[in-house]
Amino acid sequence: IVVHAAALKQVPAAEYNPDECIKTNINGAMNVINACIDNGIEKVIALSTDKAALPCNLYGATKLASDKLFTAANNMGGAAGTRFSVVRYGNVIGSRGSVVPFFEKLVKEGATQIPITDTRMTRFWITLDQAIDLVFEGFERMHGGEIFVPKIPSMRVTDLAEAIAPGVPHKVIGIRPGEKLHELMCPEESAHETLEFRNHFVITPATTYFGDFDYSVDGKGERGQPVEEGFEYKSSTNPHFLTVEELRDLCSVSASAVPVGFSGQKSQTSEGTASKSVH
């Protein structure tokens, strides 16, 4: 199996340097697809992002293109060929370039204000270990062509700032180039293609790539149900928001405190930064 986790992911940087983002996130995706087919890989999962759903920035647009390439790649493999699916999730706690280490650095430096882009901003939230668990569960459940979306909590950026820097005043500095106020993982426009399972959603392929799979029953035998018309899975309307105390625990104590995803089990694997083959 192969996990494709390589990407240029900094939203503002992509706005200023679109060519490098396109080369890595789109051309790089095609390189991985072709290499996997040429080498007879059985299953491939590409990591996606909430920014790929109705993207308003270049990074999200390149990841949407990557998602489309990986799901459509099932055509290239044929009925007995390589199977490709996608796992889409939100912000990974403490990942490189994320807001957690930035806030923590400010606290260590004795900052008297914490910069907040917008007090209304919300994000989906997941730990490193849980993100990896989702990938390996995806391998067990996939038929090929699906986009797996875990049910994960949301957080308010103001709550995160309070968790890391209690009592420190916030300074609103405005949204950065390409940023959204709220993130989306299942857009309303895909509701007719979306199935709900116990701990996750599946966005099914718009076209049949091969065979005659019933996507409502996954590879582990769990049956999903169609979502209601007009359904969307958005960080601002998510029924599960992390509290300040939960955020503080996640940032300072453990990266396994939130029971989310397919199995909710802790993995001992760290997040990768490139495509990986697992034997």
Description of each model-found segment:
Residues I1:
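Extended, charge-enriched "interface" segments that sit outside catalytic cores
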Residues H4, L8-L64, K68, A72:
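Conserved Rossmann-fold NAD(P)-dependent oxidoreductase catalytic core, especially the SDR/UDP-sugar
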Residues K68, A72-H279:
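Strand-loop microenvironment adjacent to phosphate/nucleotide-handling motifs in alpha/beta enzyme folds
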